[in-house]
């Protein structure tokens, strides 16, 4: 990596990276004892790069590309997925998840949440969630609706509506992952996860949904670097240059307005600068922001990392061994901590922070160190949309 002030601090040897990832992916699948790989493709650059790496590592006939549209996000993404499969020579399957989501109540729950803000909402309306501009403080989320006549309206979401909406829409990622693992079980394949470094580091994924995978080949690469790999791998132009989207709501939406607050090129440099301890005034010229705005971005990066710990954490294992005294009538186990009956919490934290969270992100005793920074009971704040905020 370069240094602040250099022309391209995120430059890397693309060909060498492709060769390295190909070899490591092949070894990982072999180590898992799997015969091939399943990749859910959305038509975006991340899944496209992961699919191409899998084909290089395992051969096209041992990679299944899944297209999993639903009624809010469908045709265009699925068509791009088909174009990718044809370019890579890999088999592909399309399964609509609309019926499954209807059966689980995803759309019903989502519509009920929207009607908490727009009581006259109809399913024919399109919608999306947007965040307030980065400020280094409270993040407010609003719902934008578009009526059939083309008129639009935006209203701030109260906390209850926000939580209900996120809980409902997160079902989409979880149902997709269910189908991925169904195919993986059937074929004896590994499931390939597609998050890049920004998504993995900043929590832009759903726990038990798109955050779940057996191998994550590009989770250490900045988005800028993923685009460079897409060019080197020869992906179709429509995929290699496609802007990052959310694939969640029915109105077109970028990750910038939905989650990060900055375009990916700038966000890459902000995360790089935060990890490298680059002072805000030194990074400001490179990212086109004032030093104060860089400090605000650093604050958000730290706060999201605190919240993302939960998303990366393994299950907490409660270990309560019993000694013979507990099984004998009339006898009592020793006191807690005596070694006879105790509870041990084992929750190893696996999130690879390269920079300790700013203490400001830890907030105060009445503001828990999670993704929310509530300003009032009626207004959600810093909890990013793709993951439900903690209680």
Where are these regions (language model features)?
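Conserved G/P- and acidic residue-centered "switch" motifs that form tight phosphate/ATP-binding loops
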Residues: 44
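Primarily recognizes the serine-hydrolase "nucleophile elbow" in alpha/beta-hydrolase
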Residues: 56
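Ser/Thr/Pro-rich low-complexity tandem-repeat tracts
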Residues: 355-356, 363-364, 369, 375-376, ...
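Low-complexity, intrinsically disordered or signal/transmembrane-proximal segments
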Residues: 342, 349-355, 359, 367, ...
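Intrinsic disorder/low-complexity segments enriched in polar/small residues
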Residues: 248, 256-258, 327, 360, ...
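Short, intrinsically disordered, low-complexity terminal segments
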Residues: 338-345, 358, 370, 387-388
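Acidic, Mg2+-coordinating phosphoryl-transfer loop and its flanking beta/alpha structural elements
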Residues: 69
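ATP/NTP-dependent adenylation/nucleotidyl-transfer catalytic domains that generate, transfer
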Residues: 1-39, 49, 53, 61-64, ...
């Amino acid at each position: 990596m370069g240094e602040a002030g250099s022309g391209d601090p995120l430059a890397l040897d693309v060909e060498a990276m492709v060769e390295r990832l190909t070899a490591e992916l092949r070894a990982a699948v072999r180590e898992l004892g799997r015969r091939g790989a399943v990749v859910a493709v959305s038509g975006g650059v991340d899944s496209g790069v992961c699919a191409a790496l899998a084909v290089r590592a395992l051969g096209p006939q041992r990679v299944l590309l899944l297209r999993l549209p639903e009624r809010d996000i469908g045709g265009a993404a699925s068509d791009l997925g088909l174009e990718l499969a044809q370019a890579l020579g890999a088999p592909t399957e399309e399964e609509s998840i609309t019926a499954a989501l209807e059966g689980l109540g995803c759309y019903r729950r989502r519509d009920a949440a929207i009607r908490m803000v727009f009581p006259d909402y109809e399913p024919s309306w399109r919608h999306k969630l947007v965040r307030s501009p980065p400020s280094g403080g409270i993040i407010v989320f609003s719902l934008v609706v578009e009526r059939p006549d083309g008129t639009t309206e935006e209203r701030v979401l109260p906390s209850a509506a926000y939580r209900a909406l996120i809980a409902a829409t997160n079902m989409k990622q979880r149902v997709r992952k269910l189908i991925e693992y169904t195919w993986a079980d059937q074929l004896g394949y590994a499931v390939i996860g597609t998050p890049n470094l920004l998504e993995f580091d900043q929590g832009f994924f759903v726990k038990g949904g798109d955050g779940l995978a057996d191998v994550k080949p590009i989770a250490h690469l900045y988005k800028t670097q993923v685009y460079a790999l897409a060019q080197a791998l020869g992906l179709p132009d429509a995929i290699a240059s496609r802007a990052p989207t959310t694939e969640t709501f029915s109105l077109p939406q970028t990750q910038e307005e939905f989650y990060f607050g900055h375009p990916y090129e700038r966000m890459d440099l902000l995360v790089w600068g935060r990890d490298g301890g680059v002072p805000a005034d030194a990074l400001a010229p490179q990212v086109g922001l004032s030093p104060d705005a860089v400090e605000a971005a650093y604050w958000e990066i730290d706060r999201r990392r605190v919240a993302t710990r939960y998303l990366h954490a393994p299950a907490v294992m409660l270990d309560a061994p019993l000694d013979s005294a507990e099984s004998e009538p009339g006898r009592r186990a020793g006191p807690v901590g005596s070694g006879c009956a105790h509870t041990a919490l084992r929750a190893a934290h696996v999130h690879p922070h390269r920079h300790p969270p700013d203490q400001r992100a830890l907030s105060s005793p009445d503001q828990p160190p999670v993704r929310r920074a509530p300003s009032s009971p009626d207004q959600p704040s810093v909890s990013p949309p793709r993951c439900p905020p903690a209680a």
